[in-house]
Amino acid sequence: MSSVVVVGTQWGDEGKGKITDFLSKQAEVVARYQGGDNAGHTIVFNDTKYKLHLIPSGIFYSDKTCVIGNGMVVNPKSLVTELAYLHERGVSTDNLRISNRAHIILPYHQLQDRLEEEAKGDAKVGTTLKGIGPAYMDKAARIGIRIADLLDKEVFAEKLKTVLELKNRMFVKMYEVDPIEFDDIFQEYYAYGQQFAKYVCDTSVVLNDSLDEEKKVLFEGAQGVLLDIDHGTYPFVTSSNAASGGVSSGAGIGPSKIHHVVGVCKAYTSRVGDGPFPTELDDEIGHTIREVGKEYGTTTGRPRRVGWFDSVVVRHSRRVSGITDLCLNSIDVLTGLETLKICTSYEYEGKHLDEYPPNFRVLEKCVPVYEELPGWTEDITGVRRFEDLPENAQRYVRRIEELTGIELLTFSVGPAREQTVILRDIYEA
């Protein structure tokens, strides 16, 4: 039996989808455990590019079970749209399983998300406005509606009426906007539920049975550890546990059943949205990295902020997620830069900081301490063995291993599947 968790070690967009797709080749079950359609990942399969937001990357393999776990928040409309998107392209979804305990996102969540973000003004956190945060808020407040409720017409109607009374009171009195009517939601969203009802089950049973049968199970994280609700750059975070600990609660398996935690990062750093970013580059080098790396959000299309590799960030992710293996993506993007920099620590008001501080006001004033390494000019997009990388590229990668304390599992020199080089079998380790 071997289970592997894939997490982002930075602020998301590290290329987890590609790595998950790569590791899916050997896995028998692929599961997501947190987040919603705010997380986009791009996968290249059979020379075709696909963009998914909810459904796990393993969906392209008909012999693998794909699970949407109970820790996710699911927009029924988005899910139906994504299923149709796959069906139109000839991709079967018969291998999909959806947790009956997952909470759903409804139109009032998206409205609440927008109104709250607008009300914050300059203090906004840069939400994707998908309704993720309000849905998790309702879950914690015990007024959320789950997929099991959505499929029961009477229960759905009863719960929807109750929640709308609360929400509309807030919308009308607090934000002075028109209320949302019951009929604007009920029939449409009940119909969505019926369209994916055949996939719904107790996914905790599916996952635990698979692990007990010694199947290879891959858990696919969304966003990144620095966006984790507890361990990220709070309050500029998502509303769920993106760290590996989210697997136990979000998939319904015990922590003793997790064997490997794979951390994915880029050879530099990127971020979408607001919040502190110590190594951010606002110069020509930053512009070059953004354009060469095509750093624009899968979900929002927003240009990503980019910066040098920050080992303080990745060490923090390693510690709070128990990361055992490292996947380093987008090394090729750095080709042609004369000098590369890696942040090894921070300076804050004369103090030396080796660990990531929790106070975002402190982070905003942190000055990165850099180590410089020589770059390379050789085209590395065709490299398929580590030893074939230019000497300076090898030195750069090995230094990242040393500074983060994580052994390299894969490295990527381009977006295509064959441009990801795996150094060992994670399932046999």
Swiss-Prot record:
PROSITE patterns: ADENYLOSUCCIN_SYN_1, ADENYLOSUCCIN_SYN_2
Keyword annotations of the record: Cytoplasm, GTP-binding, Ligase, Magnesium, Metal-binding, Nucleotide-binding, Purine biosynthesis
Subunit structure comment from the entry: Homodimer.
Lineage: Bacteria, Bacillati, Bacillota, Bacilli, Bacillales
PANTHER family, sorted: ADENYLOSUCCINATE SYNTHETASE
Location within or outside the cell: Cytoplasm
InterPro entries, per database record: Adenylosuccin_syn_GTP-bd, Adenylosuccin_syn_Lys_AS, Adenylosuccinate_synth_dom1, Adenylosuccinate_synth_dom2, Adenylosuccinate_synth_dom3, Adenylosuccinate_synthetase, P-loop_NTPase
Source species, domain of life: Bacteria
Active site, per annotation: D13 (proton acceptor), H41 (proton donor)
Entry's EC annotation: 6.3.4.4
Pathway named in the protein's UniProt entry: Purine metabolism; AMP biosynthesis via de novo pathway; AMP from IMP: step 1/2
Protein name as annotated: Adenylosuccinate synthetase
Broadest EC class assigned to this enzyme: ligase
Cross-referenced NCBIfam families: PRK01117.1, purA
Cofactor: Mg(2+)
Protein family according to the UniProt entry: Belongs to the adenylosuccinate synthetase family.
One Gene Ontology term of the molecular function aspect: magnesium ion binding
SMART domains the UniProt entry points to: Adenylsucc_synt
UniProt binding sites for Mg(2+): D13, G40
Cofactor-binding details, from the entry: Binds 1 Mg(2+) ion per subunit.
